[in-house]
Amino acid sequence: MGERFSGKNVVVIGGNSGIGLSAARAFAQEGAGVVITGRSPQTLESAAQQIGHGCVAIRSDVGVVSQIGELFARLTTELGHIDVLFVNAGIGAFQPIEKVTEEDWDTIHGINLKGVFFSVQKALPLLSKGSAIVLTGSIGALKGIPTGSVYAASKAGLRALGRCFAAELVGKGIRVNVVSPGPTETPIIGRTAGLPPQAIPAIREQMIRNTPMHRMGTPEEVAAAVLFLCSREASAITGSPLRADGGVVMSIT
């Protein structure tokens, strides 16, 4: 494997499982110094061991702005600068309209939108010309999904953030892109609020039926898209929503 990121500092917000873990592992294998964050100390420790290569794990809740500030204050001291920021933290929750509470709305948007915004804001002093930012979106921002209104709204907002960030930061030489996964084999499927465990297999089969490739994507496939967007090969790409969705929304622009 090549070393496209040799000597680079990479921070993965939400790097303790799924797509974030796969991306962090791939960055480390390509020579980067990697920092991952997450909320669970146990999961973080396990992830850091899997990643290896001196990966640093820091407990930080992206849903709490003060913790985001503390994280980047620490990274300012310990790293000095960041070459790649991958903001992957997010939650999925699906409820019928009539059952959504204000707390549901605030929790989902607090992580998927507010947390993403302030992660980028707090990271900016550590980013400079040539840096890359990737945000994890979702095809839910483009495709109407029953019971998915709150989640989809948060991801549509994130997609807009990505475009605005790209427009605002292009003059500083910082690229910003969004990777939008389709149905992917990650732990978030099993943790999705509102779905009992016995319903997961049927939901998974429905996802496969609705995917033109007739299979779920893998975290490694999405991670490969993330690494491409952060690499020199993508140096002319900014403000783009790259879909890694198995063709689910190929007819939607």
Feature-to-residue mapping (PLM):
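Active-site loop immediately N-terminal to the catalytic Tyr-X3-Lys motif
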Residues: 97-98, 130, 143-149, 171-172, ...
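Alpha-helical segment proximal to the catalytic Tyr-Lys
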Residues: 125-126, 167-171, 235
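Active-site helix of classical SDR
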Residues: 120, 154, 162
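Residue(s) in the substrate-gating loop at a strand-loop-helix junction
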Residues: 138
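Short C-terminal tail/terminal secondary-structure segment
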Residues: 143, 227, 238-253
